[in-house]
Amino acid sequence: MPKHIVNVGDVELISLNDNLPIRSPFVAFPHTTIEQWNEYPELMADHENGYHRWGSLAIRSSGKLILVDTGMQGEGCYLLDDMKRKGIDREAVDIVVFTHVHPDHVGWNYTDGKPNFPNARFLVPQKDWDYWTKPENINTVEYVVPQVLPLKENGVMDLIDGEY
């Protein structure tokens, strides 16, 4: 079985990549030390920079194809190509679940205004929706308007309430 696939009972989990930028690990983990990172050389590109994986997860279960997060999109990003390479038809995605509404989680919803997952329902956390669609927040980041708002406008979004 390929390394990017794990089966748990009847559920198939497929690891998907969008990008593997090389940058300082302190961007995401500011309270760590270089000594701590050096204990994991497989995560380090060189003595100062680490691999910072952007990815998603596809889940096949009970006849459904679920995508957890849609990556970043942009320069160097390749989620749609990785899906194709791993045999996942983006038009077959039934449900997209967002863990949260950050650019590396909602970036491939649309390309040039066209949906990349045209047959999917999108599950969006209520708290994130409420926060990012407030008038004072909506234009503070460039991805909400082109990648998240059209989900509601096109009637393909369901809000999820509570903790998960």
Describe the function of each predicted region:
Residues 71-73, 102, 128:
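Catalytic metal-binding/acid-base residues of hydrolase active sites
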Residues 1-5, 110-111, 142-148:
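Intrinsically disordered, low-complexity boundary segments flanking structured domains
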Residues 14, 104, 130:
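Nucleotide phosphate-binding site architecture
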Residues 88, 121-164:
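Metallo-beta-lactamase
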Residues 76-123:
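Active-site metal-binding motif and surrounding structural segment of the metallo-beta-lactamase
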Residues 26, 109, 133-136:
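Short, well-ordered secondary-structure micro-motifs
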Residues 2-85:
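Conserved beta-strand hairpin/beta-sheet module of binuclear metal-dependent hydrolase folds
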Residues 22, 112, 131:
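Flexible, glycine-rich phosphate/dinucleotide-binding loops
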